[in-house]
Amino acid sequence: NILGNTSNDWWLSSVKLEAGDTQTAFADTDYGSELEKCKRYTQVWQESGHEHMPWTGAQVSTTRSLVIMFFEKEMRAAPSITKTDADWQIWVRGTTGCDITSITFDQISTVSGRLDCTHGSGGGAGEAVIFAHDGSGSTGTLILSAEL
């Protein structure tokens, strides 16, 4: 008896309630389709090693770089960003990585944004850069949110 104990679990899924007496076909969507819909509202970028993000940019000076960030999917509105600064580096040709001390997110649209990064000294103005995790063993996270 499912109701015989308050600790019993009861699950119900794939049920569709409709008003009236006309039944329509049940449209069950797959996980991938639902995930793509969710990416219009939230996207999470998370790395846990010396891994490069898919974003590149250029140095403005020896301690500042601008990186273009393209989103996985167009978002429903220009998102806000939540980040952990200490876990990221800028990689410049000929260096092992410069620790980022601050990140500002600007020039935001529904498909991209710009990371304005202040970092340790390395390279020079005009050098190409790669945005990367610092490999410290912690997990760096960037969360884009275009919630309602």
Regions found by a protein language model. Give the residues of each.
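Extracellular polysaccharide-targeting segments
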Residues: 1-50, 144-147
